[in-house]
């Protein structure tokens, strides 16, 4: 079996390191092409999300390929990292667990399956997959579906948005007296907005580069859309600022925030940065009057209640074990009709 996985996740690296290795959607094709050539991979799929950056590949010599891939990624990032490495059946098990939400920060969440499917579809469309990875990923999707239908791993799970709202409430108390400014109106932003609204938020302001998305999200929750170019104008009056805008560079630096804090008359400002790479300057933590958290702060909140789902986790893990055994038994090198999920 010549498949492998190499990468970083929230289990092994803080966001300060993960963001250095993150690959944005606009650069994914170029990075994948360069990686495949540099590491001598016969097949490759690149998965980059807020909580993980992973390379799934097939090569004649997986160990050597992982060394080349590791060197390529570290050279590109300008940072060193201790990558997790999986080969053969271990790589199969890891992908099946990832696709099923068993390896997620929010245990049992379903967004990761869509992200894995998107990563595979992009690689498939670019001709980067072949018999080994086509079969591996198609089986992973079946395993994830079985976990979803035969276990209740997702029941009672908190979403990223609900964890964010819970963290804000723990810092500020009753959100009915709070005004929130949300940067980004994508799936994550919508999840956050709905979770804040469900906790009785006094007012929601939404800023997004595409104004129509901000307007639609705000209108659906009784909020107000603000121009993305002028969102900083609301820093003096907002109580909560949450970023998930996937910006190409920092949206807010400490020096930019300081003047707004000076006119807040001691009112605390809660900032939460859910983006990877991060949208807010980490130096903001040193400013008096502001509290800044990043996505890693959600892990403790997301883990609450997991003990109540222990039986479902065990059931899901048993399903994965059975699917891995079936995959190995049938042989990883047998060609499969290539059909994108």
Residue locations for each model-derived region?
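Glycine-rich phosphate/diphosphate-binding loop of Rossmann-like nucleotide-binding domains
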Residues: 165, 169-240
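Glycine/serine-rich phosphate-binding loop and adjoining beta1-alpha1 elements at the start
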Residues: 78-176
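N-terminal loops that bind phosphate or other acidic moieties
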Residues: 10-12, 16-29, 188-194, 198-200, ...
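Adenosine-phosphate binding glycine-rich loop
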Residues: 19-26, 258-341
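Short active-site oxyanion
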Residues: 43, 201-205, 267-270
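Internal alpha-helical scaffold of NAD(P)-dependent oxidoreductase catalytic cores
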Residues: 63, 67-80, 124-128, 134-143, ...
């Amino acid at each position: 079996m010549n498949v492998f996985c190499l990468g970083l996740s929230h289990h092994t690296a803080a966001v300060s390191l993960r963001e250095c290795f993150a690959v944005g959607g606009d650069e994914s094709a170029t990075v994948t092409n360069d990686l495949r050539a540099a590491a001598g991979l016969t097949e490759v799929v690149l998965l980059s999300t807020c909580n993980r950056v992973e390379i799934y590949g097939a090569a004649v010599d997986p160990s050597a390929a992982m060394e080349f891939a590791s060197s390529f990624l570290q050279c590109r990032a300008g940072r060193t990292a201790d990558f997790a490495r999986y080969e053969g059946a271990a790589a199969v098990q890891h992908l099946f667990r990832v696709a099923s939400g068993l390896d997620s920060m929010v245990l049992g969440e379903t967004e990761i399956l869509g992200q894995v499917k998107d990563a595979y579809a992009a690689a498939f469309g670019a001709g980067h997959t072949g018999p080994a990875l086509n079969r591996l990923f198609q089986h992973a999707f079946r395993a994830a579906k079985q976990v979803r239908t035969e276990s209740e791993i997702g029941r009672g799970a908190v979403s990223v948005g609900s964890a964010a709202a819970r963290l804000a409430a723990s810092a500020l108390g009753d959100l009915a007296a709070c005004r929130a400014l949300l940067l980004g109106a994508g799936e994550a932003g919508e999840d956050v907005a709905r979770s804040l609204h469900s906790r009785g938020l006094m007012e929601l302001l939404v800023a997004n580069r595409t104004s129509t998305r901000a307007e639609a999200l705000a209108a659906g929750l009784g909020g107000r859309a603000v121009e993305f170019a002028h969102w900083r104008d609301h820093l003096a009056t907002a109580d909560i600022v949450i970023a998930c805008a996937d910006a190409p560079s920092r949206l807010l630096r400490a020096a930019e925030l300081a003047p707004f804090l000076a006119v807040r008359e001691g009112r605390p400002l809660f900032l939460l940065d859910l983006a990877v790479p991060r949208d807010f300057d980490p130096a903001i933590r040193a400013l008096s009057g502001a509290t800044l958290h990043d996505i890693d702060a959600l892990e403790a909140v997301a883990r609450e209640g997991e003990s109540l789902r222990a039986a479902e986790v065990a059931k899901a893990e048993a399903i994965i074990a059975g699917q891995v055994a079936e995959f190995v038994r049938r042989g990883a090198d047998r060609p499969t009709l290539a059909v994108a999920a």
